[in-house]
Amino acid sequence: MHRPPLPLVLLLLCCRAQAGEIIGGTESKPHSRPYMAYLEIVTSQEKQVACGGFLIRRDFVLTAAHCAGRSVTVTLGAHNIQKKEDTWQRLEVIKQFPYPKYEPVGVHDIMLLKLKEKANLTLAVGTLPLPPHVTFIRPGRMCQVAGWGRTGVKEPASSTLQEVKLRLMEPRACRHFRAFDHNLQLCVGNPQSTKSAFKGDSGGPLLCAGVAQGIVSYGLSSAKPPAVFTRISPYRPWIDEVLKEN
């Protein structure tokens, strides 16, 4: 039976950033993931939503295409997104580059964000390496995801960065997602486990051996794993082209 997928953005309630956690994860050590970016987005319908992302160059953040909006503000160097620290760098996005063939709740869910100013690289703010174009990471690997998404479907929000280890699954585990494409996407999270990415985690990185291999894309509204992540390696030529031209 086909079940509708759910983009993993988080609606911001009462005009404030009320982000939560990854389901089944633990709180990250503060500033142990200096590449993490918290995105505050105003949509074309004037709604405020949140996504994750990650710094790949001092002036570029990589995220999911469904996190596009009328305006985007990026916070770097954050741990507790509701408690401002000296480590914070808040930067405006001046241009959004969603992949040209992006299909909502489908494939090509990847986007580059050009920052108005270059981030200052510090102990709390740094870049994350990307895989080469030829990389094809296979099922069975254990990887890590981090984000400020909810702890559960009905759980109260938390504000600190969370992380969880998730297994890369065989493509058949994502067969209930009609648009799933194993060549362009990753099936992430053991169906027998409760650990998963959820609302607010969209756009965050999947780390395998310290390299960003995927981007949180969509999952079931029940939060039951697995979820679908965009593979990064097939898009390296496009990423490199955008970075070179900007």
From Swiss-Prot:
Disulfide-linked positions: C51-C67, C143-C208, C174-C187
Keyword line: Disulfide bond, Glycoprotein, Hydrolase, Protease, Secreted, Serine protease, Signal, Zymogen
Organism: Ovis aries (Sheep)
GO biological process, one term: proteolysis
Active-site residues from the entry: H66, D109, S202
Function: Putative mast cell chymase.
Residue stretches making up the Peptidase S1 domain: 22-244
Entry-linked Pfam families: Trypsin (PF00089)
The keyword Heme is assigned to this record: no
E.C. numbers: 3.4.21.-
Name of this chain's protein: Mast cell protease 2
Gene3D superfamilies: Trypsin-like serine proteases
Family to which this protein belongs: Belongs to the peptidase S1 family. Granzyme subfamily.
A GO term, aspect molecular function: serine-type endopeptidase activity
InterPro entries documented for this protein: Peptidase_S1_PA (IPR009003), Peptidase_S1_PA_chymotrypsin (IPR043504), Peptidase_S1A (IPR001314), Trypsin_dom (IPR001254), TRYPSIN_HIS (IPR018114), TRYPSIN_SER (IPR033116)
Positions annotated as propeptide: 20-21
Glycosylation site positions: N120
N-terminal signal peptide: 1-19
Superkingdom of origin organism: Eukaryota
Gene Ontology cellular component list: cytoplasm; extracellular space; intracellular membrane-bounded organelle
Keyword Signal: yes
Compartments reported by the entry: Secreted; Cytoplasmic granule
Enzyme class: hydrolase
